[in-house]
């Protein structure tokens, strides 16, 4: 898809002359707004785009029937990117959720998808309990799940990609009393949603405000939960402005697409160093106490206790795990390195005890690491994994 073929008819006025911006066709865009009265099911209204007579870059988003809101949308060319500004004004107190979809024109099956820090290709390397194509080929997520509030769709057939990115200062957030279904927010949030959907075989960018998650929400690691849709109050006479930026380009492959998206995200969001009250040296000193408090030295293989740890008590457990969650050998290497740097003989001594105990007692009869040992329950897990074995070898070498 080429946005220059997608968006037709908009002229951006600069000085006396008008310069043609990214072309726009309402047929490729669909928008809707859902309104909710607390205690009742929401009502969804489709929005038709009607171009304003005196401004060819602005549209009135007309609902399918009368609602107590006025919604307008303005498009502006920003150095070859299309910036969309949506303005919502309440004629009376309303709880709302606004959404918009952009059809890329790409065949959904030809596409790979990217959401920074959360979604790569089709996420098929993730467990089925995490968001992936194992569950659905369409996903909407909260923007704060991502390293940047952006979704990208890359067509391997067309060698082209399209992204949508939210532009905001993200100053507000509010807790909700429920985690699923239609929920009423108790205050203002800056968090919207972004994602992709398969609409009749066509890959579609979806975005809106406030947040939605569908077809599942992801409440914690490896835990999918029912979908959620948030509604924020807009009081009579109040207005809210929402801004997204569309960007498209031709590119050779998906890896180059990811690189381009990261560079674009950094340039757009300009992340700054966060000033903290504690120095890195102080935090390392505090965190190194884990190597002291968690050390277990009365078992055939010594280890740092962390697996199945109860955070309320931080009591030591009986599970010695080489890699992954337990990270016993890598933690021993970290403790050894830090201990030598800081001349902490206690850390160095315990680290060597762990290495020596594993070299003596940590291998199975077939020569692999005993990856997970449950000492009080008196059994060793027999299934081996590349990750734990490789982490153990890496730490020892």
Residue ranges: model-predicted function:
Residues 329-345, 391-397:
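Well-ordered alpha-helical scaffold segments within catalytic/enzyme domains
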Residues 246-250:
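Short, charged beta-turn/beta-strand-edge "cap" motif at the junction between a beta-strand
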Residues 222, 226-230, 310-328, 375-391:
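Solvent-exposed loop and edge beta-strand segments that line ligand/cofactor-binding
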Residues 23-27, 36-40, 46-236:
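Beta-strand/loop-rich accessory regions of lumenal/periplasmic or secreted enzymes
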Residues 1-6:
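Bacterial N-terminal signal peptides that target proteins for export
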Residues 25-30, 37-40, 234, 238, ...:
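Low-complexity, Ser/Thr/Pro/Gly-enriched N-terminal "stalk/linker" regions
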Residues 348, 356-397:
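Extended amphipathic alpha-helical coiled-coil/heptad-repeat regions
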Residues 8-17:
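Hydrophobic h-region of N-terminal signal peptides that target proteins for export
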């Amino acid at each position: 898809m080429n946005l220059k073929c997608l968006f037709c008819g908009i002229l951006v006025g600069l000085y006396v002359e008008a310069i043609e911006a990214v072309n726009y066709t309402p047929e490729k865009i669909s928008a809707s707004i859902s309104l909710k009265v607390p205690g009742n099911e929401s009502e969804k209204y489709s929005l038709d785009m009607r171009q304003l007579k005196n401004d060819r870059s602005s549209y009135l988003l007309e609902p399918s029937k009368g609602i107590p809101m006025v919604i307008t949308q303005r498009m502006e060319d920003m150095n070859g990117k299309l910036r969309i500004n949506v303005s919502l004004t309440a004629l009376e107190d309303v709880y709302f959720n606004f959404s918009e979809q952009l059809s890329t024109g790409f065949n959904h099956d030809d596409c790979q998808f990217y959401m920074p820090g959360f979604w790569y290709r089709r996420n098929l390397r993730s467990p089925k309990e995490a968001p992936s194509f194992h569950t659905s080929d369409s996903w909407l997520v909260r923007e704060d799940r991502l390293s940047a509030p952006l979704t990208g769709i890359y067509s391997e057939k067309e060698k082209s990609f399209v992204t949508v990115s939210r532009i905001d200062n993200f100053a507000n957030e509010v807790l909700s009393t429920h985690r699923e279904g239609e929920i009423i927010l108790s205050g203002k949030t800056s968090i919207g949603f972004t994602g992709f959907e398969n609409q009749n075989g066509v890959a579609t960018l979806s975005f809106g405000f406030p947040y939605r998650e569908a077809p599942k929400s992801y409440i914690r690691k490896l835990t999918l939960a029912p979908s959620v849709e948030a509604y924020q109050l807009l009081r009579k006479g109040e207005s809210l402005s929402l801004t997204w930026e569309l960007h498209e380009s031709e590119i050779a492959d998906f890896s180059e697409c990811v690189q381009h998206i990261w560079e674009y995200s950094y340039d757009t969001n300009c992340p700054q160093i966060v000033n903290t009250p504690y120095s890195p040296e102080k935090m390392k000193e505090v965190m190194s106490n884990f190597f002291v408090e968690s050390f277990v030295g009365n078992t055939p293989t010594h280890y740092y206790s962390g697996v199945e740890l109860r955070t309320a008590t931080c009591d030591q457990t009986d599970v010695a795990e080489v890699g992954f969650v337990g990270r016993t050998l890598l933690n021993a290497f970290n403790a050894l390195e830090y201990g030598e740097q800081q001349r902490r003989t206690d850390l160095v001594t315990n680290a060597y005890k762990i290495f020596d105990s594993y070299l003596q007692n940590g291998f199975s009869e077939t020569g692999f690491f005993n990856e997970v040992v449950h000492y009080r329950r008196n059994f060793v897990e027999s299934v081996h994994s590349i990750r734990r074995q490789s982490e153990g070898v890496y730490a020892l070498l």
